[in-house]
């Protein structure tokens, strides 16, 4: 879920914190990518029609591999250096949110069965996407593929968004690419939405800068975290009737959740009986992340050509000619990106960003939309 309504809240109250950037403007940049979010997108979009999905000869789904392979090559060809960060064990506080998601998938599965029996193609398409879940096997497959491609992988101890933010705060990467707005709540200095969208969608990258958020909202980082908790996050329920705009007003007026609770009209607003906002706050401020330099050995290496062919072609039925051409693209891209950003050697490049247009910013583009098929390296349909 991320932070409920945060995109609109920022568009209305802190518009200068958001800038549309060209995909190509990140040439030479190291970017931490929320891997699970990307894999979820691939499973929903790549080669999928209704309940049909790309599979190998054994009937195992390969949409995530095709999506990860093609999208990563696109990043590399643009001179971008991705670092994929995978989720570890979720915090205990997230159990309730995960239970809600499980329940929604179960409901969607029942609805999908009804849609199939009725032959309603539109509902089949809709409900089949709601049943998608990223599994350990999907993650393991993508980790193996990325390592074969010479792209660094970080396995977070807990939340991937928190680890991405930590990499950004420590200067190891330029920004964080995800669709979950709680990357900002974890304090990522620069947060990028739509970087992992397919080029066919032609949507500019939306770059958020946390320093400008705080400046425009006139909040401290602690107050911004409280604002996000009040708006609605993955770690605890929100107070019914308090949305983002009301939460901002209350934080500006009272400064913290504790003071808000002391002054809140209890007849108008019902506070949850067990509301672990303080624990949620601690998770945002002091997340469980890897800081050991040895565990964060982030290096981009040459692709293992034989390994890629073995994994994609021999084990997963991808087309050998397409995979071979893709490997050449990786090698060419690696040489290109080794040049580094031009401004490191010459004068700074002019900023190509343009002001954000609020009407073009959907609150959630990930878990729904893109219905276009993506042509890729291989696979076959599975019903």
Swiss-Prot record:
CC terms in the record's Gene Ontology section: mitochondrion; nucleolus; nucleoplasm
PTM info: Phosphorylated. Phosphorylation upon DNA damage induces relocalization to the nuclear plasma.
Positions of region (Interaction with PCNA): 338-346
Binding site for Mg(2+) 1: 34, 87, 159, 161
Subcellular location: Nucleus, Nucleolus; Nucleus, Nucleoplasm; Mitochondrion
Cofactor note: Binds 2 magnesium ions per subunit. They probably participate in the reaction catalyzed by the enzyme. May bind an additional third magnesium ion after substrate binding.
Assembly information from the UniProt record: Interacts with PCNA. Three molecules of FEN1 bind to one PCNA trimer with each molecule binding to one PCNA monomer. PCNA stimulates the nuclease activity without altering cleavage specificity.
Entry function: Structure-specific nuclease with 5'-flap endonuclease and 5'-3' exonuclease activities involved in DNA replication and repair. During DNA replication, cleaves the 5'-overhanging flap structure that is generated by displacement synthesis when DNA polymerase encounters the 5'-end of a downstream Okazaki fragment. It enters the flap from the 5'-end and then tracks to cleave the flap base, leaving a nick for ligation. Also involved in the long patch base excision repair (LP-BER) pathway, by cleaving within the apurinic/apyrimidinic (AP) site-terminated flap.
Protein known as: Flap endonuclease 1
Organism: Arabidopsis thaliana (Mouse-ear cress)
Lineage of the organism: Eukaryota, Viridiplantae, Streptophyta, Embryophyta, Tracheophyta
Name of the gene encoding the protein in the UniProt record: FEN1
């Amino acid at each position: 879920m991320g932070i409920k309504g945060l995109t609109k809240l920022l568009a209305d109250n802190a518009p200068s914190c958001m800038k549309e950037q060209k995909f190509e403007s990140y040439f030479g940049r190291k970017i931490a990518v929320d891997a699970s979010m990307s894999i979820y997108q691939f499973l929903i979009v790549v080669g999928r029609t209704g309940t049909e999905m790309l599979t190998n000869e054994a009937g195992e789904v390969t949409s995530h591999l095709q999506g990860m392979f093609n999208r990563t090559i696109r990043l590399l060809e643009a001179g971008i250096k991705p670092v994929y960060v995978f989720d570890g064990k979720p915090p205990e506080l997230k159990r309730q949110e995960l239970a809600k998601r499980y329940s929604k998938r179960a409901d969607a599965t029942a609805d999908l069965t009804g849609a199939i029996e009725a032959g309603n193609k539109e509902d089949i398409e809709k409900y089949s996407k709601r049943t998608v879940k990223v599994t350990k096997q999907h993650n393991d497959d993508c980790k193996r593929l990325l390592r074969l491609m010479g792209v660094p992988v970080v396995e977070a101890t807990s939340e991937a968004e928190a680890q991405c933010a930590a990499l950004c705060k420590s200067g190891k990467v330029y920004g964080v690419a995800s669709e979950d707005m709680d990357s900002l709540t974890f304090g990522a200095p620069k947060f990028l939405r739509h970087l992992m969208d397919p080029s066919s969608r032609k949507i500019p990258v939306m770059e958020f800068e946390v320093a400008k958020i705080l400046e425009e909202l006139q909040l401290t980082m602690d107050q911004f975290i409280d604002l996000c908790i009040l708006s609605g996050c993955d770690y605890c329920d929100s107070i019914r009737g308090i949305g983002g705009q009301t939460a901002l007003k209350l934080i500006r007026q009272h400064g913290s959740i504790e003071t808000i609770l002391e002054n809140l009209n209890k007849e108008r607003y019902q506070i949850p009986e067990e509301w672990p906002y303080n624990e949620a706050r601690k998770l945002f401020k002091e997340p469980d992340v890897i800081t050991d330099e040895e565990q964060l050995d982030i290096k981009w290496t040459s692709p293992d050509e034989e390994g890629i062919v073995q994994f994609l072609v021999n084990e997963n039925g991808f087309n050998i000619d397409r995979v071979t051409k893709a490997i050449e693209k990786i090698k060419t891209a690696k040489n290109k990106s080794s040049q580094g950003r031009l401004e490191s050697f010459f004068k700074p490049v002019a900023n190509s960003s343009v002001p954000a247009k609020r009407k073009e910013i959907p609150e959630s583009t990930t878990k729904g939309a893109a219905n276009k098929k993506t042509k890729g390296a291989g696979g076959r349909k599975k019903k």
